[in-house]
Amino acid sequence: MSKQTAIEQDGVILEALSNAMFKVELQNGHVITAHISGKMRMHYIKILPGDKVKVEMSPYDLTKGRISFRYK
């Protein structure tokens, strides 16, 4: 996603899946699967169901994304 323009949206974590994957409900009502970005893994940032997050998605596949920020 570095060379293309990533689509950023806010969402809420619905459920935690295996391998640091999460189901995220976006503001527009769509539910996608997303994984944690590398920097968040490196700094041990915990994400729990109910947390508000910022998700980056590729314009080519809008069903998968990367969690880049957790709001406080």
Swiss-Prot record:
GO CC terms, sorted: cytosol
Subcellular location per the Swiss-Prot or TrEMBL entry: Cytoplasm
GO molecular function, one term: translation initiation factor activity
Record's keyword terms, sorted: Cytoplasm, Initiation factor, Protein biosynthesis, RNA-binding, rRNA-binding
S1-like domain location: 1-72
Pfam family, one: eIF-1a
Gene3D superfamilies per record: Nucleic acid-binding proteins
Function text: One of the essential components for the initiation of protein synthesis. Stabilizes the binding of IF-2 and IF-3 on the 30S subunit to which N-formylmethionyl-tRNA(fMet) subsequently binds. Helps modulate mRNA selection, yielding the 30S pre-initiation complex (PIC). Upon addition of the 50S ribosomal subunit IF-1, IF-2 and IF-3 are released leaving the mature 70S translation initiation complex.
Record text on subunit structure and interactions: Component of the 30S ribosomal translation pre-initiation complex which assembles on the 30S ribosome in the order IF-2 and IF-3, IF-1 and N-formylmethionyl-tRNA(fMet); mRNA recruitment can occur at any time during PIC assembly.
Listed NCBIfam families: infA
Family: Belongs to the IF-1 family.
Protein name as annotated: Translation initiation factor IF-1
Native species: Porphyromonas gingivalis (strain ATCC BAA-308 / W83)
